[in-house]
């Protein structure tokens, strides 16, 4: 318990250096922090979701958080998680022992933080809600506080220095989480899940960050067109030179055939 109070302020300071937090609906949380048992049921997006919610709850009584047993395999991580109130739970085998322990702690007025989806969602949308949170709340006679954690990044996921909005909704009274008719237990659990889902969706609809504008594409810088190679001009077609009429040469005068006259026959 002493280590919890030593580590919690240190983690609070470090987290507020690396991220920007905004808490809405803190009055709903305070309305159940009066020694009564209560369960915080939150959506789950990032591994650090429980840490962020824990430092904003900042209760003088330690908040218990069920966490999958794989996270405790690393000795240092397991020690830190244990100091911060995490309790190992075997999700695949129906760990009734841990559920009973959490129920007893909740009955004593200790808050329990549960992620009803049972795992993180990659899309940011609510997954299928499991029954563990409702079983603990019903057995402990606890009120249930819906909690929505919203990341103000373009993809809705956690990034360094992004804005984080944690919204606490109006508590669901313990009386509405009791199953009086065991023959209709499944129908009663379905009704509770639908009620919680509607509350969580409404918290998102009323407190979502405005959509960030898509990054404008810079206009492409037009490269100067390469100078076109000069096109060799085709030689002009050679016009045929008109034939000059060749003047006819005057025909040479025909020489008169000179027929040698026979000499006069000599007179006999």
Language-model regions, residue ranges each:
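Glycine-rich, highly charged phosphate/nucleotide-binding loops
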Residues: 20-24, 93-98
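Non-catalytic C-terminal accessory region of glycerolipid acyltransferases
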Residues: 97-235, 240-243, 248-268
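Short, flexible loop segments at the rims of nucleotide/cofactor-binding pockets, characterized by
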Residues: 14-20, 42-43, 88-92, 123-124
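Short amphipathic alpha-helix with an adjacent loop that forms part of the alpha/beta core around
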Residues: 28-33, 103-104
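Short, basic, glycine/proline-bearing loop/turn elements
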Residues: 14, 83-88, 116-119
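A secondary-structure boundary/capping signal
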Residues: 25, 42, 67-68, 85, ...
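Catalytic core of membrane glycerolipid acyltransferases/transacylases, capturing the structured
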Residues: 32-93
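A transmembrane-helix-recognition feature enriched in membrane-embedded lipid enzymes
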Residues: 1-28, 59, 75-84
